[in-house]
Amino acid sequence: MPSYRSILTVTTLAPGCRPEEVEQAARAVTRLESWDIAIASGQPRVTARFTAIDDAEARATHRQILSSVREIADVPRARLAAVVRGRSHYLAP
């Protein structure tokens, strides 16, 4: 089954929320292959890797992850990428 990445810039947490709840929110949507936290261009970025049958299912899962994480924190930017031979190829929304 193909792999995909939801790449989210995550900024301000909602009042009373803890940083680890961002990961919990993503994991509540689907089984994740991996989870990564990084700083990119001075902003916190999380990457949730998951599998899907095809691009359409991946887009639906990405939207669900984004919606779930937005209950915990502001997400000013989100992108979906297909993983092909270990490299990310961004998909149009």
Describe the role of every protein-language-model region.
Residues 1-93:
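Long, contiguous binding/interaction regions
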